[in-house]
Amino acid sequence: MRSHYCGDVNKSHVGQEVTLVGWVNRSRDLGGVVFLDLRDREGLIQVVYDPDLPEVFNVASTLRAEFCVQVKGLVRARPDSQVNGQMKTGEIEVLGQALTIINAADPLPLSMDNYQNNSEEQRLKYRYLDLRRPEMAQRLIFRAKVTSSVRRFLDSNGFLDIETPILTKATPEGARDYLVPSRTYKGQFFALPQSPQLFKQLLMMSGFDRYYQIVKCFRDEDLRADRQPEFTQIDIETSFMSSEQVMAKTEEMMRGLFLEMLNVDLGEFPRMTYNEAMRRFGSDKPDLRNPLELVDIADLLKEVEFAVFSGPANDEEGRVAALRIPGGAALSRKQIDDYTKFVGIYGAKGLAWMKINDLSLGLEGIQSPVLKFLNDSIVNEIVSRTGAQTGDIILFGADQATVVAESMGALRLKAGEDFSLLQGEWRPLWVVDFPMFEKINGNFHAVHHPFTAPRGVTAAELEANPANRVSDAYDMVLNGCELGGGSVRIHNQEMQSAVFRILGITDEEAKEKFGFLLEALRYGTPPHAGLAFGLDRIIMLMTGASSIRDVMAFPKTTTAACPLTNAPGFANPQQLAELGIAVVEKAVKTED
């Protein structure tokens, strides 16, 4: 039905007859000549119809937005005065000689020109129209090219694309599972995988030493701008490779991807330990474009008569950190109050501050409500450590170390945006040496997952002192976003059982949930390591989209619903009976 895509026609085709198909982007009747902008996935082209062919001209005059049409015509160069540098095809146009309406379009339920006027609900309900917009189409085309590039790289490096099951067993991986009832085994349920983690480890045990899969994963969790109930991972696992080798290979892949797709050389990725990242930036995924850093000052404040500072300074689990903002002395009291409310979202009880109005005046040039609690040497040392200059402000966080890291880390990011401090376009890094466990409400939890190997200890040593052990794990971070994370896996039964015990998983529970894994670890399991990238997040960053919903063809809303298909929906009584399921209606309270 066509000879060319609309966006592919150029000056080399001048004088040629072409057949095009697509949708009417816009139609204009200007003084007896109809100008038609025809659109397909590759772009727009201008088609001109004049009254010399009255039958065709009359049909062209009836066209409206989103009619699906076929156009036949002659490519000609535009006059210099009419060249449109904003269009890929702006140097040429097509003189229409034939026109067929393939399918008419009713008046549209959403705006195609001013899509900002459409609600998120409208865009998702009529997604097939929203995806016709060039911006959306280009993102999906870009996504397809990214996955093609990733496959080529992994294929050429000996990785095998192997599918793993979608219907599997529920395992504790941090989020709630989506459950699928079994008709055959009434009362029992499959779970949709949160990741192919255990199956890819079993593939390593099966001898497939380089595996990958671009795979759908499912998590029933509260949604944010960068979360969806179903998402796509670039999943990778290797045998007989160290963490250094896995990082080197996947870094090579990511650098090649950015060079091919964006012509961006990311350079070598620096390394940073988890502890350093938390100390300097208050985050395990720091945005290195932001030059602001947290500075520890607890050692200066142990003896001050200001409990807000001295309390955390003398607490082993406390922290006092300072954040210098260049030019921040210009902040009004209201703006400082807004920052105080902001850190309160993250659990901070307040936000002390110190304005450096004129450093040449010494303490006379410094303004702060806490100045009366600090002697000259402490103030001078704070100014020195933070590198504060005239016109700066120093903000203070004092609380439990976790609260200080989270609140001041978030404030660092906000201030970096507010003061336009970001430097450079792309700043990747590896974050390594994560803690093996974290304690929540007195119980140990795996920082990554329970199959991550500790670094350099035996099972007995791990159980003797789990709190201070480091995992052989690594996260790739770009511009403050975690692109992917991975680790060396546990490859012997003794260590895996020890980790389960530390996590409070009894032997009986471990056998019930992970018996197949513990059994497999008895039969010559090779050392193995891997990593998984969030494909949706990578595409979002590379295209500059504001949400992963804008780089997925048919995403869900923030309430995990699909307005297009009205999913989820109710099952009919026959389906429920076949599954042996009874729906319990939510109890309604009635007043006595």
Curated annotation (Swiss-Prot):
NCBIfam families given for it?
aspS_bact, PRK00476.1
* Biological processes per GO annotation: aspartyl-tRNA aminoacylation
Q: Does the keyword Protein biosynthesis feature in the UniProt annotation? A: yes
Binding of L-aspartate, residues: 173, 219, 448, 489
Outline the subunit composition.
Homodimer.
Tell me which PROSITE patterns the record gives.
AA_TRNA_LIGASE_II (PS50862)
- The reaction(s) this protein catalyses: tRNA(Asp) + L-aspartate + ATP = L-aspartyl-tRNA(Asp) + AMP + diphosphate
Q: Identify the EC number(s).
A: 6.1.1.12
Q: CDD domains in the record, alphabetically?
A: AspRS_core, EcAspRS_like_N
The family database entries (Gene3D superfamilies) matched by this protein are listed as:
Bira Bifunctional Protein, Domain 2, GAD-like domain, Nucleic acid-binding proteins
Which residue spans adopt a coiled-coil conformation according to this UniProt entry? Answer: none
What protein family is recorded? Belongs to the class-II aminoacyl-tRNA synthetase family. Type 1 subfamily.
Identify the residues that bind ATP. Answer: 219-221, 228, 482, 534-537
What keywords sit in the KW lines?
Aminoacyl-tRNA synthetase, ATP-binding, Cytoplasm, Ligase, Nucleotide-binding, Protein biosynthesis
Q: What is this protein called?
A: Aspartate--tRNA ligase
Q: From what organism does this protein derive? A: Shewanella baltica (strain OS155 / ATCC BAA-1091)
The record's section on InterPro entries has:
Aa-tRNA-synt_II, aa-tRNA-synth_II, aa-tRNA-synth_II/BPL/LPL, Asp-tRNA-ligase_1, Asp-tRNA-ligase_1_N, Asp/Asn-tRNA-synth_IIb, AspRS_core, GAD-like_sf
